[in-house]
């Protein structure tokens, strides 16, 4: 999976800004050396809004699979999702298309911080452990560590996409993906996602 700088997810398809931003994004996708500042200045002049590109990325995959985009109603949240498969024919099935839709909705609604636990900010993780230890400092040491690990597992289920409860059932996202893969007799792997929200800063 490759990632490069790209303003694509900043599109707003059902607003005046979207009508201006979409051609900018399309042009940059075709030519990554395009002068975004020149186009940004032109867009500001056309619609009278102070447009700022605070974050811009793109996703791509090597081999079978798909990269899909979703803009939520109201154009306040946008999602890019990259999912890999082993078979080209998998991507044409209704089950796979539904999976793409479901996972983008999951990302929109649940706002995960990372794909899985290996991608979490380790300093944040250690801070969560410290908070849990402080909360239960009066417990026996052995009990504290068990409680802390339980709290961390809960934290994973809140902030890691694959560990989150799937929006449509009581299983995890990881288990749902596995069930669809089994149904299609293929291997399906979520490789990466990007979530954008209007008003976010580069530090968000």
Question: What is the role of each PLM region?
Answer:
Residues 1-204:
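N-terminal assembly/interaction segments in proteins that build large macromolecular machines
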